[in-house]
Swiss-Prot record:
Pathway the protein takes part in: Amino-acid biosynthesis; L-arginine biosynthesis; L-arginine from L-ornithine and carbamoyl phosphate: step 3/3
Family affiliation: Belongs to the lyase 1 family. Argininosuccinate lyase subfamily.
Protein name, per record: Argininosuccinate lyase
Principal place of residence: cytoplasm
Coiled-coil portions: none
CDD domains: Argininosuccinate_lyase
Length: 461
């Protein structure tokens, strides 16, 4: 069913029909389209814009269509122009002339953005729980690895000893911010545009606030031109999705490195690994690699919508039909990535001994030698110079700092005493960093408690 045609002398070319159709993309919004139509029909009846009988017949017809579509009795007609025309056409088929009254006082321009906002409200709410599920896994792994010492890196060079719990909690912080951004984005999605019409509202005495209440929106949009041409909320959602994928990608890169024989810090479960068609020994971290690769796909979705919107004058233009494919692809990709990544992290084996061995290489306790000298009264810059010389000598002699004799230490500075060996033990290096945010057991437990509280505050039961 076409929702237009009286002004035309002939039908559109079949190629144009195919080119113009969006039913394959927007059909996933059939529930939202019907929900919006139910609220609109109720308002039309309450405002005496259509008769009570017409409103009731439309309502019962829409509810029956929703039930039958949910049960698969009614299938989407892929020759329809879009989900809006399909639902209205199906309604008219079932209830006759009353169905033709549904579109009174609205346009597809405000209808489509209503559907999209309704869909996004549900999608964002669900996505936040996927993030919470990942946070729960990170919390579990962090609790198991409070005492697992590993090397921390800068510039991909070993820097200072930390713990695996500390490292995992760094990603937990990133995902906390992601959830916060989604919550903030939700506020701008949660505005009801129906009643804006094609661009200039309506001459009918419609009640936009009533529709907003029926549909669970916190408020109505304030400018009809902006309402039908606004896709900021979709772009903002894709921006949030892109940042989630960026964080997953960074984590994936480390997972991939840690799986190598060169690192051997973790082993992924067989259920989250793949093999090679030619090399029998291979166990590949394909999940992490795909997450890393799919990040570019979500970035592309964001750029698609930014590019679609960059040159559009007010108000609605058909270009905006391209918004949903990019948005839905981004949502689907992030949801699947989060769920799969969550399972990968939950089932991975941590090789604690290898992590500790790794922390013992690369002079990760060098900063602690300098701090030791400073605490003994030496200016930091002088201490830095002395320790640099110690490291250079150790490299030459192929030994670690803690392997130096007291005589060798004193050759670099008479400040050194026997307590240097305790000061540069890896466990001491970690546990002395008790500052808020640090890797010590005391600090990490505070971070774990904060994460527990965050999960409790945001998890839906």
């Amino acid at each position: 069913m076409k929702l237009w045609g009286g002004r035309f002398k002939k039908g559109t070319d079949k190629l144009v029909n195919d080119f113009n159709s969006s039913i394959n993309v927007d059909s996933r919004m059939y529930k939202e389209d019907i929900e919006g139509s139910l609220a609109h029909a109720s308002m039309l009846g309450n405002q005496n814009i259509i008769s009570k009988e017409a409103s009731d017949r439309i309502t019962s017809g829409l509810l029956e269509i929703l039930k039958r579509m949910d049960n698969g009795v009614i299938e989407i007609d892929e020759t329809s122009e879009d989900i809006h025309s399909f639902v209205e056409g199906t309604l008219t088929y079932y209830i006759g002339e009353y169905g033709k009254m549904l579109h009174t006082g609205r346009s597809r321009n405000d209808q489509v953005t209503l559907d999209l906002r309704l869909y996004l409200k549900k999608a964002i709410t669900s996505l936040k729980q996927d993030i919470i599920a990942l946070e729960e896994v990170l919390l579990e792994k962090a609790n198991e690895n409070i005492g697992t010492i590993m090397p921390g890196y800068t510039h991909m060079q070993k820097a200072q000893p930390i713990t695996f719990a500390h490292h995992l909690l760094a990603y937990a912080e990133m995902f906390k911010r992601d959830l916060g951004r989604l919550s903030d984005c939700y506020k701008r999605v949660d505005e009801m545009p129906l009643g804006s019409g094609a661009l200039a509202t309506s001459t009918y005495p419609i009640d936009r606030e009533a529709v907003a209440r029926d549909l669970g929106f916190s408020k109505v949009t304030l400018n009809s031109l902006d309402s039908v041409s606004d896709r900021d909320y979709a772009i903002e959602t894709l921006s949030c999705l892109s940042m989630i994928m960026m964080h997953l990608s960074r984590f994936s890169e480390e997972i991939i490195l840690w799986c190598t024989n060169e690192f051997s810090f973790i082993e992924l479960d067989d259920g989250y690994s793949t093999g090679s068609s030619i090399m029998p020994q291979k166990k590949n971290p394909d999940v992490a690699e795909l997450v890393r690769g799919k990040t570019g796909r979500v970035y592309g979705d964001l750029m698609t919508l930014l590019t679609v919107m960059k040159g559009i004058p007010l108000a609605y233009n058909k270009d905006m039909q391209e918004d949903k494919e990019a948005l839905f692809d981004g949502l689907d990709t992030v949801v699947l990535s989060l769920k799969t990544f969550c399972g990968m992290i939950k089932t991975m084996k941590v090789k604690k001994e290898n992590m500790r061995k790794g922390a013992g290489l690369g002079f990760t306790n060098a900063t602690d030698v300098a701090d030791y000298l400073v605490k003994k009264g030496m200016p930091f810059r002088n201490a830095h110079e002395v320790v640099g010389e110690i490291v250079l000598q150790c490299i030459k002699d192929n030994k670690m700092i803690e392997e130096l004799t007291m005589e060798e230490f004193k050759n670099f500075s008479p400040t050194f005493e026997e307590d240097i060996y305790h000061a540069i033990d890896l466990l001491t290096c970690v546990e002395e960093r008790k500052v808020i945010g640090g890797p010590s057991t005391e600090s990490v437990k505070i971070q774990i408690e904060a994460l527990k509280n965050f999960i409790a505050e945001n998890k839906e039961v």
